[in-house]
């Protein structure tokens, strides 16, 4: 499945504005590059792409800008003359505007600052892609990893169990008052027990989920019913890694995978009646003129298994890991795009595809998790992925055409009505707790509505 071309019939100039987090390298950078390419190839000449990307510091903003402008120039050079935009108004073509902005999803004051800046501009966001995140690993169990590579390569690289998690990672204090109180304690030699403690926030949970969740709420004034909120998940978003009693993954044996399971639960249940109250609270939508206001839609995607720096390997081990990933693809694994650009296809598909291709498809066949899959020779496409408890489309036993039914997690169980009901119950509870956490932290940050 690829992004369809839109008609050239509409001549009124319009701007498609998309925000991508964590774009300085890896998947985030690849998503930005692919957005540029597919926008220029599929959208009419009357449309302009305003690509907003985030990084955590000014140097990365500048470096990413250079990379993206170089990519844009390369793409323009390859385009046929009829698709090549005029260069009279802006370097690199007037159909693409590239802008970098700062945010650190693990620092809530920067999340609020970003939202304040964008809302102040009043420019609608057509899509956001929540990609930024951290792994929370502290090393590799090399013996276990090598044994898995030698005996079960495809499975070991699709559902790895050899990364050593750093259990219990806690984010730095978020409120200025708490930070200044701690400083005053040091200066005045006051007993730390007299300083009110700030509730802990799981570092991985904050960077991967909650920072984006709050940003979604703060940016809600810029969303229209046609806007799209695209979450990036993982093939490793599996039930054993998540416990609803440990929402933030502070006790989880794999906080990264736990955070991605949270992502799946949030997105897949976002259109159910049981979560409607909480979703409307997040998006600030109630009733308008006696009618329930329409909401932007949430989508969830995953890039398959790609080679990025998130694992923190040195160059030597990184090379052999790359060899292993390609070998897994050559052994017919469907989930090894390897190249981040190929892995970006699912996120870009969810951001750019016309309404009749994606929204209507989910309305007919059910809500799905869209993954980046490849053939043996690397030809990439977008396909539905099974989500434990939800299935492929929210209907037990139904597998829509084009879904990937190989490379499955070995702990899976066949879909059932009970499993589907349990997934919804867990999702509704998760939404309730996320909304409670959001309101708590808005109060702590002095941002209550």
Label each residue range with its predicted role.
Residues 1-107, 113, 117-126, 135, ...:
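NAD(P)H-dependent oxidoreductase Rossmann-fold/reductase module
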Residues 122, 135-139, 218-226:
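A short helix-coil junction within the Rossmann-fold of NAD(P)-dependent oxidoreductases
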Residues 125, 165-184, 201, 222-235, ...:
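Active-site loop of short-chain dehydrogenase/reductase
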Residues 131-189:
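Conserved NAD(P)H cofactor-binding loop of Rossmann-fold oxidoreductase domains
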């Amino acid at each position: 499945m690829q992004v369809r071309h839109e008609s050239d019939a509409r001549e009124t100039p319009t701007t498609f504005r998309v925000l991508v987090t964590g774009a300085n390298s890896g998947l985030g950078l690849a998503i930005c590059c692919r957005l540029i390419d597919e926008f220029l190839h599929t959208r009419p000449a009357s449309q302009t792409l305003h690509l907003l990307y985030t990084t955590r510091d000014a140097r990365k903003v500048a470096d990413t800008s250079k990379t993206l402008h170089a990519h844009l120039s390369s793409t323009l050079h390859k385009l046929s003359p009829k698709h090549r935009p005029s260069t009279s108004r802006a370097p690199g073509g007037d159909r693409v505007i590239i802008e970098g902005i700062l945010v650190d999803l693990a620092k809530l004051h920067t999340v609020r600052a970003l939202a304040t800046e964008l809302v102040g501009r009043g420019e609608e966001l057509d899509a956001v892609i929540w990609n930024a995140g951290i792994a929370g690993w502290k090393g590799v169990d090399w013996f276990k990893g090598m044994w898995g590579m030698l005996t079960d390569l495809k499975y070991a690289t699709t559902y790895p169990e050899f990364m050593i998690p750093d259990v219990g990672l806690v984010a730095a204090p978020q409120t200025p008052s708490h930070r200044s109180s701690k400083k005053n304690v040091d200066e005045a030699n006051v007993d730390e027990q007299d300083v009110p403690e700030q509730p802990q926030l799981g570092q991985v949970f904050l960077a991967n989920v909650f920072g984006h969740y709050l940003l979604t709420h703060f940016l809600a004034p810029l969303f229209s019913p046609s806007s799209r909120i695209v979450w990036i998940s993982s093939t490793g978003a599996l039930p054993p890694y998540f416990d609803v009693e440990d929402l933030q993954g502070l006790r989880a044996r794999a906080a990264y995978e736990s955070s991605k399971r949270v992502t799946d639960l949030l997105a897949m249940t976002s259109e159910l009646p049981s979560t409607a109250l909480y979703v409307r609270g997040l998006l600030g939508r109630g009733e308008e003129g006696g009618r329930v206001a329409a909401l932007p839609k949430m989508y969830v995607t995953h890039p398959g298994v790609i080679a990025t720096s998130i694992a923190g390997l040195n160059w030597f081990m990184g090379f052999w890991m790359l060899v292993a990933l390609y070998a897994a693809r050559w052994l017919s694994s469907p989930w090894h795009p390897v190249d981040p650009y190929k892995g970006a296809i699912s996120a870009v598909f969810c951001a750019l595809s016309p309404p009749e291709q994606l929204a209507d498809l989910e309305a007919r066949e059910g809500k799905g998790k869209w993954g980046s899959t490849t053939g043996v020779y690397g030809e990439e496409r977008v396909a539905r992925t099974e989500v434990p408890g939800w299935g492929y489309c929210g209907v037990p036993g139904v597998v829509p055409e084009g879904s990937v039914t190989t490379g499955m997690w070995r702990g899976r169980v066949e879909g059932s009505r009970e499993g589907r009901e349990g997934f919804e119950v867990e999702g509704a509870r998760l939404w309730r707790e996320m909304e409670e956490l959001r309101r708590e932290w808005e109060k702590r940050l002095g941002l209550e509505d």
